[in-house]
């Protein structure tokens, strides 16, 4: 049969109470040791910071006001030299902008050589000035270099079709002045002028005669270039340019000549 269960249970699996108390003591000791180490580390950091601040304050206090002013003047002068160097460098870039690489190299070398020529004694001033004039005359200016690079090597009258599409009188007058310089043109330009028929006004009320060149376009638009001003005009404007005013049919007063007007 079943035996009676005693009223109190005995501990069988857990550690004795003495061992548990000793384990708690060890854990407390470890915690205390860790906290002490942390405090020591914090103290060392604070001491280092204090020592650094003390050293910097001592150095600042040891300097006289004159030394401090001298240091500030050195810093300001160095900043000014850097700023002036940057400005001169940027201005040199703007001056050389738009030139081909070979002209850029010559101009930069000229600038450096001219800066070195300013240093010799007064005995060599005459030779330095003559050398500088010779070098400056050999190197083209920025405007001449730009015009020589950008100016096309096409005939003067090859710009005429471009002006017909522009429509503004200002551009037409600018290119018309280029066409007025046809006196010094070469054989190619003269051949082109011979292929273009010449025109002149006839039968006007004032009896004036104005000569020009006739140009035809694919859209049927007609433009006439007057010889006197080099302007690109329509038939009605060409008749008005002759001083006859507005007419009903301007083509009746314009005659195409067989020989070119050269």
UniProtKB/Swiss-Prot annotation:
Coiled coil: none annotated. Keywords: Nucleus. It comes from the Eukaryota. InterPro entries: Ninja_fam, NLS_NINJA_AFP-like, TDBD. Signal peptide: none annotated. One of its GO terms (cellular component) is nucleus. It is found in: Nucleus. One of its GO terms (biological process) is negative regulation of DNA-templated transcription. The keyword Signal does not apply. Disulfide bonds: none annotated. Residues 48-69 are annotated as: Disordered. Belongs to the Ninja family. This is Ninja-family protein 3. It comes from Zea mays (Maize).
